[in-house]
Amino acid sequence: MKRIFVFFLLSLTLLMTTFPSKSLSAETIKWYPYEEGMTLGKSQHKKIFINFFAEWCGYCTKMDKGTFVDPEIVSYLNKNFIAIKVNADKENTLSTRYKVRGLPSNWFVSDSGDQIGNFPGYIPADNLLPILKYIQTDSYKQMAFKDFMNVK
């Protein structure tokens, strides 16, 4: 019996070291509920990124498993924005306020709560990073996004 227990422990240890959990070692986006995130945005003077999603939405899941785990996206969002995740099916009032017509819907809001703009639909990580920089640097106040991309 003792040998079986030792064998089990060794096997478990080997299994845990062979397949480390990503969630234990990787940084993740700090998502806030809507009201808390809006309050934090104002108090920390940070712009707000709002991701409207639904559990049935395939592209929302694709963003969760791809875009929102990309280390550059995670780092940039956590450092420069307050990130809010809103389930569009459960938060009808917010979905109406932001005129969400399709999912995913990605909104940017100023620290004072003014809507800056919406980038609807699935956005891969390599496309989202320049959008984040465009909004965070206030370049949206001086130029169109396509012009921002040409200047970079």
At which residue positions do the language-model features occur?
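Positively charged n-region of N-terminal signal peptides that target proteins for export
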Residues: M1-I4
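Sec/Tat signal peptide C-region and signal peptidase I cleavage site
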Residues: F19-A26
